[in-house]
């Protein structure tokens, strides 16, 4: 990077391991400025529980970004609504979590920050607070007024994007339309080029049905929907292979020559990726007007405040965001 950049981090659920992980991030120096959108006393209390040093520096958008010294974080303060006790969910803090996400998202939209890295939230407690919330991906899509976003998870060796995300199985076949597939593949192809630096990305596309429909004998979605869309996009120059049966696609003879896999639904592609690299994966939202990465795990309430949480996924998410910033410069 030609000059220091500034990224924003949201720790997520205050009763979970998110604050622990952010404190652990601060134990090393970073070539970018880490602005944490959170309650300051929460972070200092959690650092004391973990026995780790932490100094919170005031955030000033008018001051040029600078590399982050070890033992420090730059604080963009948002106040808790109620005390946060590790491991104990509090409905009153649901609005706090959403406020941190909104402020961080707005800062990215206003070009305050070069990227957003999110810690794990607890969807249930946010909804219990009376705030409809499906997940980070949908929240940022709506707030940024993006036309369409795509969820992709990645490890060092594998990238898996999803045509559909949090839908019940009975609704998936109807959701796989030509328009949806066209938009998802176009976004995936575009962001692999612009944010990952791949000039001509090769994308493997899963079928929807067992054996990719077996020539129409196990479902016709491949013939009616998936194949026509792939043919159209290939004619535009995209390097697409498929539809392939999901039970045979995830093997070296295919993956060694591919840049990403497009799965038709959540549990078709993600079990393989999480088996291969759980705790080292990153969730990326494609199609947003800014870079957003996230950890690939949950709030782990039972580990909060104990110093047992693994910071590996958060470090990977932050490092990937830095690489993506470089690719977009």
From Swiss-Prot:
One GO BP: pyridoxine biosynthetic process
Cell compartment(s), UniProt: Cytoplasm
EC number: 1.1.1.262
GO cellular component term of the entry, any: cytoplasm
The reaction(s) this protein catalyses: 4-(phosphooxy)-L-threonine + NAD(+) = 3-amino-2-oxopropyl phosphate + CO2 + NADH
Matching Pfam families: PdxA
Molecular function GO terms recorded: 4-hydroxythreonine-4-phosphate dehydrogenase activity; cobalt ion binding; magnesium ion binding; NAD binding; zinc ion binding
Binding-site positions, a divalent metal cation: 166, 211, 266
Source domain of life: Bacteria
Tagged with keyword Metal-binding: yes
Keywords assigned: Cobalt, Cytoplasm, Magnesium, Metal-binding, NAD, NADP, Oxidoreductase, Pyridoxine biosynthesis, Zinc
Cofactor: Zn(2+); Mg(2+); Co(2+)
Biological pathway: Cofactor biosynthesis; pyridoxine 5'-phosphate biosynthesis; pyridoxine 5'-phosphate from D-erythrose 4-phosphate: step 4/5
Signal peptide (residue range): none
Record-linked SUPFAM superfamilies: Isocitrate/Isopropylmalate dehydrogenase-like
List of residues binding substrate: 136-137, 274, 283, 292
Cofactor: binding details: Binds 1 divalent metal cation per subunit. Can use ions such as Zn(2+), Mg(2+) or Co(2+).
InterPro entries: PdxA, PdxA_fam
UniProt record similarity statement: Belongs to the PdxA family.
Remaining remarks: The active site is located at the dimer interface.
Self-association and partners: Homodimer.
Known role: Catalyzes the NAD(P)-dependent oxidation of 4-(phosphooxy)-L-threonine (HTP) into 2-amino-3-oxo-4-(phosphooxy)butyric acid which spontaneously decarboxylates to form 3-amino-2-oxopropyl phosphate (AHAP).
Protein name stated in the entry: 4-hydroxythreonine-4-phosphate dehydrogenase
Organism: Salmonella arizonae (strain ATCC BAA-731 / CDC346-86 / RSK2980)
Lineage: Bacteria, Pseudomonadati, Pseudomonadota, Gammaproteobacteria, Enterobacterales
């Amino acid at each position: 990077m030609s000059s220091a950049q500034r990224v924003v981090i949201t720790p997520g659920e205050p009763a979970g391991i998110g604050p622990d992980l952010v404190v652990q991030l601060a134990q090393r120096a970073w070539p970018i400025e880490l602005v944490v959108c959170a309650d300051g006393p929460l972070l200092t209390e959690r650092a004391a529980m973990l026995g780790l040093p932490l100094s919170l520096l005031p955030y000033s958008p008018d001051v040029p970004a600078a590399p982050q010294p070890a033992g420090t974080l730059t604080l963009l303060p948002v106040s808790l609504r109620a005390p946060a006790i590790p491991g104990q969910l509090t409905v009153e803090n649901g609005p706090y979590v959403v406020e941190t996400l909104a402020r961080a998202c707005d800062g990215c939209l206003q070009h305050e920050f070069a990227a957003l890295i999110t810690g794990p939230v607890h969807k249930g407690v946010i909804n219990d607070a009376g705030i409809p919330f499906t997940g980070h991906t949908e929240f940022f899509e709506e707030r940024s007024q993006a036309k369409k976003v795509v969820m992709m998870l990645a490890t060092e060796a594998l990238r898996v994007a999803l045509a559909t995300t949090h839908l019940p199985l009975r609704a998936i076949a109807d959701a796989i339309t030509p328009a949806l597939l066209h938009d998802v593949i176009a976004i995936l192809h575009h962001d692999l080029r612009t944010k990952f630096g791949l000039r001509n990305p090769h994308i493997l596309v899963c079928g929807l049905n067992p054996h990719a429909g077996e020539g129409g004998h196990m479902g016709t979605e491949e013939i009616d929907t998936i194949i026509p869309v792939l043919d159209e996009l290939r004619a535009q120059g995209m390097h697409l292979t498929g539809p392939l049966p999901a039970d045979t696609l995830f093997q070296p003879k295919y993956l060694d020559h591919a840049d990403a896999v497009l799965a038709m639904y959540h549990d078709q592609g993600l079990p393989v990726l999480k088996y291969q690299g759980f705790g080292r994966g990153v969730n990326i939202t494609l199609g947003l007007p800014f870079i957003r990465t996230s950890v690939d795990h949950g709030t782990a309430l039972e580990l909060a405040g104990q110093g047992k949480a693994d910071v590996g996924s958060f470090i990977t998410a932050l490092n990937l965001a830095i690489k993506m910033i470089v690719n977009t410069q």
